[in-house]
Amino acid sequence: TVAPNNRMGIDNYLEMEGLVYRVTFEESAERTSMPRLNYNRMIQNISETDDYNSLIYHPEDYWNHINAGHGIYRYTNLNNPDVYFNENIQRLIQNYRSSFLQLGLQNLYSSDEDGKVKTLEILDKMENYFPQDVIPTTDAELDIQIGRIYKQAGQPEELKNRLKSVQKRKDISLETQMYIGQIYMNEFQDYDAAIEHYEKLYDEYPYIPDFLYTLVQAYAKAERRSDAVELLEEWLGSHPNDSQAVDWLSILASPLQQ
């Protein structure tokens, strides 16, 4: 892992080929915040070999593998549920996942008409090498972002599954909790799931107005105006100077326009 400030200003001469950068003599055509990606070489360098009996001892062995189109890595036991992985190893595995995610995004935003299919193939390969139930993603927000990539590639249910998994975690921030509800409400229009999520948060943190506001929004979008009005009236009983709540109550309590 190389921090941007440790690249000594040679970003435009770096090329990602797997888990390492290669320093090249060729400058990138476009200046970006990240070094360019050698897609084909990277695919080979992070894919598991299909022949465990063919070992790489010498440089020519490596090039024979490359020229034959074979994968290089041997991800031994990283999908074995009987092996214990401590927190440090779990964090290191995120570096492996990062390479797969870069390739997935490259496909997703490319002009290739099969880009989404290729993205799903790469993500499924990643899940096969490092199953989520064996080596969990240590960062809850990264877990959600992986789900969002699945959704963009055509598998929205994978995002929902990951949201449900993240909701069970004890280490997620309140900002992430808020974000989860917004995804249910705005991306899936699953107002029942959003309401259930925000009701739990509001019960646990009744003093945080943002959870009240988002729960009111979810009630309103689900056409449960009476619940939204009741919640606002209850809140204003102890927070009479909350101008935003007053404004929302005046709107939601007014008769519907025919």
Regions found by a protein language model. Give the residues of each.
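ER/secretory pathway lumenal C-terminal domains and tails of membrane proteins involved
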Residues: 1-152, 158-165, 171, 200
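Alpha-solenoid helical repeat scaffolds
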Residues: 101-102, 136-145, 174-179, 209-217, ...
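Residue-level signature for tetratricopeptide repeat
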Residues: 106, 149, 183-184, 218, ...
